[in-house]
Amino acid sequence: MGQKVDPRGLRLGITRAWDSNWYADKKEYVKYFHEDVQIKEFIKKNYFHTGISKVRIERTSPSQVVVHIHTGKAGLIIGRKGAEIDALRAKLEKLTGKKVTVKVQEIKDLNGDAVLVAESIAAQIEKRIAYKKAMTQAISRSMKSPEVKGIKVMISGRLNGAEIARSEWAVEGKVPLHTLRADIDYAVATAHTTYGALGIKVWIFHGEVLPSKKEGGEA
């Protein structure tokens, strides 16, 4: 029986790059890894409202960390005259005890980002909008983007308060999960309702890419 895997991890080194870019010996590896997790959790928890899709981390030296934030609302993170981003940098330096540089990259196509689409569906469901309506509207908006070739959405849980949990999905366009050169964006989100938690999964196909055009440059 086939096993389902995260399409992003399956394509690492082929069409996608790693979100953490650094090298370390055995003694420092665990320390750096946990530090990366702390940084990402801190940013996503405190700046969730800014529509954060991804946080990439680079280490130029043992005492310097570069944090790249991909967000749909860059202005909220930067703030007036850079006040917010300066405050964020100070908090991260206190958290890590190292010199931190924060770089913000705004996502231009919000409907082409799987994380933002999944979180949008979850937010609508939590506002008591019917899950089918939220799902079909998200698919319709995404397919209007010229960068999106196909999208698949699956929602699982006690749909409409049913006693038995089930899954429903919808797909439009082409989503070739078995093609490794296919640029597949994938995300998972959770909607908390009065009947329990609903899981939302989103796959977005951006077309086939060559290894020389890997996402994010070098891994």
UniProtKB/Swiss-Prot annotation:
Domain KH type-2: 39-108
Keyword Ribonucleoprotein tagged: yes
GO biological process: translation
GO cellular component: cytosolic small ribosomal subunit
Keywords annotated in UniProt: Ribonucleoprotein, Ribosomal protein, RNA-binding, rRNA-binding
TM ranges: none
Pfam families: KH_2, Ribosomal_S3_C
Superkingdom of origin: Bacteria
Keyword Ribosomal protein in annotation: yes
SMART domains from the UniProt entry: KH
A molecular function GO annotation: rRNA binding
Main function: Binds the lower part of the 30S subunit head. Binds mRNA in the 70S ribosome, positioning it for translation.
Family to which the UniProt record says this protein belongs: Belongs to the universal ribosomal protein uS3 family.
Subunit structure: Part of the 30S ribosomal subunit. Forms a tight complex with proteins S10 and S14.
Name this protein carries in UniProt: Small ribosomal subunit protein uS3
Natural source organism: Fusobacterium nucleatum subsp. nucleatum (strain ATCC 25586 / DSM 15643 / BCRC 10681 / CIP 101130 / JCM 8532 / KCTC 2640 / LMG 13131 / VPI 4355)
